[in-house]
Structure formats: C-alpha cells, structure tokens
Amino acid sequence: MPTRAVISLTTGLEDPEKVTVAFLVAVGAAEGHRETLMFLTKEAVRLALDGFAKATACEGCPPLAELVKRYEAAGGRFLVCPICFTARHLADDGLVANAALGGTVPMWEWIGDEPVTTFSY
C-alpha cells in the first residue's frame, strides 16, 4: 500500500470549492501519516503565499486557512511550479515555510520508484 500521496492542484481561489476538496484530501493523507506533497500550478501557486489562502467555500465547509494550518502541522509540503509562479510576478520570499519552488523534475524525484497515491484537481 502506498505510504505517500501527491495532490496536483491547478485552481486557486476562483474556485474555492475545488481548492477545499483538494486540501481535505491532502490533510487526510498527511494526518493519516502519509508523506504528502501538493504540486501547485497555474493560479494555485498563490495558495503557497503566506496569508493568501483565506476563503470559506460553502456553508459547512471548513475555512481554507484552517486546512492550510492542519496540512502544515501534519508535515505536508508544497511544491510550487516556478514557471507559473514567475509568470504571475510573485516574490518567493513570501512563500510559506513548507513550500519550495520546483517543477516536474523535483516532483518525480520526490515520487521516486515507490508506489504513490495521486489526485488531480
């Protein structure tokens, strides 16, 4: 059984429900003691900026900021597409502590040869 998970997210706060679902999956994996990596591309790269992930998708949904805190507390990591990040003229000194710029090569290095559960949103 895979002990690691990769969640790929392309959507930012323009679709807070999709972001919330992706974070619920990531938090579940990380809190379930799986090494967890969220690969953020397109508008999702903004979610790795300190203080940006603030939204509540729907009535009854947990606030995104709470999910981000739980993800970090459980050891979850973000890998942020550097092409997407640079295209949006964002500053990497604003990244949260558990985020790093890195593309597909570092993602595949992280995956390695062991089985990994993947989700894409």
Where is each model-derived feature located?
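Short, glycine-rich nucleotide/cofactor-binding loops
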Residues: 6-20, 52
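Histidine-anchored nucleotide/phosphate-binding helix
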Residues: 19-33
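Anion (oxyanion) recognition and catalysis
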Residues: 30-31, 72, 112
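Short internal beta-strands
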Residues: 36-41, 78-82
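N-terminal beta-loop-helix "entrance" segment that forms/cooperates
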Residues: 44-58
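A glycine-rich helix N-cap at a beta->alpha junction
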Residues: 54-87
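C-terminal structural segments of small proteins and small subunits
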Residues: 88-114
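Aromatic- and Gly/Pro-rich donor/ligand-binding loops
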Residues: 119-120
